[in-house]
């Protein structure tokens, strides 16, 4: 009777061992990864709560690569956009800046020329009137150089962040075509100093048209040769213009 009950017990133990070894053999499938179509699940350990990825773990690189490409693409786009914007702004602002620079240079140059001529006369004359004029023109010349600096001409007071002027340009509200010389002439600082220079021109009876163009074209060749011969004969030396 004892042996009759022993065989079922052995049979049951054998069955349990077979089932257990079958479960252990399935663990080796993860070495090579799951099939492409199989889903991946997270298995949590009941002791410490750690998470282990099941199935093919290579798919976790896709979000990282996607984020990397998006970041690099954004940077490339910003870099290219900046380059195009800077070039476009330079192309649009160069013409206006050149016109402003020429007119400001003319103002500074005329004042410097008048101041230099008066300084020569003041040094040679004992009349205090020339000394007073030299002091006045010196202050005027210094003020012009200070107020017509680049950072002041292009200050936020006169220009917006988009590069558009804030001051009123004649004819703009009427819908007329406004060109760069019109904008430059309407600039408050340049308008002020061009007016002051015009007063000095009238004060000293200057003829600016005489200084324009080529002097060789204004004086015939025969007269130029004759004038040079007279200078050599008299031994004269050319000096600065003295008013």
UniProtKB/Swiss-Prot annotation:
Primary location recorded for the protein, binned into one broad class: cytoplasm
Source species, domain of life: Eukaryota
Residue span of region Disordered: 36-60
Record InterPro entries: Essential_protein_Yae1_N (IPR019191), Yae1-like (IPR038881)
Region of interest (deca-GX3 motif), residue spans: 73-113
Keywords: Cytoplasm, Nucleus
PANTHER family hit by this protein: PROTEIN YAE1 HOMOLOG (PTHR18829:SF0)
Protein name: Protein yae1
Organism: Sclerotinia sclerotiorum (strain ATCC 18683 / 1980 / Ss-1)
């Amino acid at each position: 009777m004892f042996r009759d009950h022993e065989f079922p017990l052995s049979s049951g133990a054998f069955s349990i061992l077979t089932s257990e070894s079958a479960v252990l053999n399935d663990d080796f499938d993860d070495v090579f990864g799951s099939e492409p179509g199989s889903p991946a699940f997270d298995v949590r350990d009941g002791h410490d709560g750690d998470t282990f990825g099941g199935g093919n773990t290579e798919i976790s690189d896709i979000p990282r690569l996607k984020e990397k490409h998006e970041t690099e693409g954004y940077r490339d786009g910003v870099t290219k956009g900046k380059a195009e914007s800077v070039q476009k702004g330079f192309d649009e602002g160069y013409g206006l800046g050149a016109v402003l620079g020429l007119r400001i240079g003319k103002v500074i140059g005329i004042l410097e020329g008048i101041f230099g001529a008066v300084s020569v006369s003041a040094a040679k004359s004992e009349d205090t009137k020339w000394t007073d004029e030299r002091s006045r023109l010196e202050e005027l010349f210094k003020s012009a150089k200070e107020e017509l600096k680049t950072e002041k001409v292009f200050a936020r007071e006169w220009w917006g962040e988009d590069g558009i002027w804030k001051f009123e340009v004649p004819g703009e509200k009427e819908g007329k075509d406004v060109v760069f010389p019109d904008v430059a002439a309407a600039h408050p600082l340049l308008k002020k100093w061009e007016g002051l220079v015009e007063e000095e021109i009238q004060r000293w009876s200057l003829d600016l048209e005489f200084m324009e163009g080529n002097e060789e074209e204004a004086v015939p060749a025969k007269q130029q040769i004759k004038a040079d011969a007279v200078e050599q004969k008299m031994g004269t030396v050319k000096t600065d213009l003295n008013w």
